[in-house]
Amino acid sequence: MQVLESQKLSGHIRVSGAKNSSLVLMAAALLADRSVFLSNVPLLTDVEVMSKLLVSMGVELRRNKNQLEIMTSGLSLFSKDLSCEAFHSLRASFFCIGPLLARFGEAKIPLPGGCRIGARPIDEHIQALKALGARVEIQNDYVVAKAISPQKRLIGARIRFNCKSVGATETILMAATLSQGTTILENTAEEPEIQDLATMLNEMGAKIQGAGTSQITIEGVDRLKGCSYTVMPDRIEAGTFLVAAAITRSPLTISPVVPEHLEAVILKLQECGCLIEYSGNTLSVIPRKNLQAVDITTRPFPGFPTDLQAPFMALMTTVKGISKIQETVFENRMQHVGELQRMGATIVLEGNTAVVIGGNNLKATSVTGGDLRSCAAMVLASLAANGTSVIQGLEHLDRGYEDFAEKLNAVGANISRTHSVPLSSQE
């Protein structure tokens, strides 16, 4: 990708459906005994990989652009046509273990993968599945789980997570919907994607209360039906475009968004000196020319999202002053620091804390995005750099941003790609 310095952006950017919601909702569809219709599903390589994984389990999929019909009548326990590598490439593939275990009383799923941004163990998932009455073992790179009750059903339980894990909360939330009795989950993650999942499951006939808080109660039911559901807007994509406006000192409007999902980001941008106005599901951002350096510490929702740490660091390199950026969610999420330094940024890295001495003019060069969000940060930094930058590692970008370059070009950026990963709009 070649990115030319953008003096000013102006206009409106449409936010796609949430990647992280889409993936878990696709897995949740496995719980239904009828078709599930999802709309606002983004065209992303992660979604395509997840689609192929579901098809390999006997699921029939029909896609028309951003709409997806998932039919589970042919669902089988084990993937027959896809290698473990396909599962390893997508961490969200592990979401399938909960629905399979809930419906069939057993499941066999390869160990998950995803971006290399530190250890994201599945210990919490496994311990919670055991608490629901499953025997869980790791055999030759597979997680094998079986319900041990005579009825081959999971049994409701009170489970307290050791940490606020989004993946574990979602996995056990799905598994418990078809369990016998009531499950109470404590110290649960509170991310909006969990609320999105619970809302769809309730429309399918589940009985879930408390999603979005630190305690969720699930009353098990005998079956879940199909439904039609619209994926919520992607809060991380929206936040990325807010940072794009700030880093280029440009006015932009962004929609659709759920402002409550972005409160921590909006507060930090306002602290920087950006004027942000609300109108329904639309945000308008008008940055001041002279922004101020601010500190951030990543936290689980409702704190500042780790997925926007890299884009925000790129912004801080363009602001005069010293900012301290602390990463507390993942232990290996500073891969972008070296690339920003190659562009002329002054950053001192001490473990998971970066001290950014901002105000230097970034210079265009060749950089590589090592993961999804650092790749987005490289694009944003290049918009503010003098000259033309070349960005490698676009396979990461295509995992989580739909039409990223096209959306930015529509508001005045000058970005060209020499190669793109083809995404089929119909299947």
UniProtKB/Swiss-Prot annotation:
Output the Gene Ontology terms for molecular function: UDP-N-acetylglucosamine 1-carboxyvinyltransferase activity
The protein's matches in InterPro entries, at most eight in alphabetical order, are given as:
Enolpyruvate_Tfrase_dom, Enolpyruvate_Tfrase_sf, MurA_subfamily, RNA3'P_cycl/enolpyr_Trfase_a/b, UDP_GlcNAc_COvinyl_MurA
Catalytic center residues: 115
Q: Where in the cell is it found?
A: Cytoplasm
Would the keyword Cell cycle turn up in this protein's UniProt record? yes
What catalytic activity is recorded? phosphoenolpyruvate + UDP-N-acetyl-alpha-D-glucosamine = UDP-N-acetyl-3-O-(1-carboxyvinyl)-alpha-D-glucosamine + phosphate
* Cellular component aspect of the GO annotation: cytoplasm
The entry's protein name is: UDP-N-acetylglucosamine 1-carboxyvinyltransferase 2
What job does the chain carry out? Answer: Cell wall formation. Adds enolpyruvyl to UDP-N-acetylglucosamine.
Taxonomy, superkingdom:
Bacteria
Residues reported in the UniProt entry to bind UDP-N-acetyl-alpha-D-glucosamine? 91, 307, 329
Q: Which SUPFAM superfamilies match?
A: EPT/RTPC-like
Q: What is its EC number?
A: 2.5.1.7
**Top EC category:** transferase
In the record, the note on similarity to other proteins reads: Belongs to the EPSP synthase family. MurA subfamily.
Q: Where does this protein hold phosphoenolpyruvate?
A: 19-20
Q: Which GO terms describe its biological process?
A: cell division; cell wall organization; peptidoglycan biosynthetic process; regulation of cell shape; UDP-N-acetylgalactosamine biosynthetic process
Q: Identify the keywords attached in UniProt to this record, alphabetized.
A: Cell cycle, Cell division, Cell shape, Cell wall biogenesis/degradation, Cytoplasm, Peptidoglycan synthesis, Pyruvate, Transferase
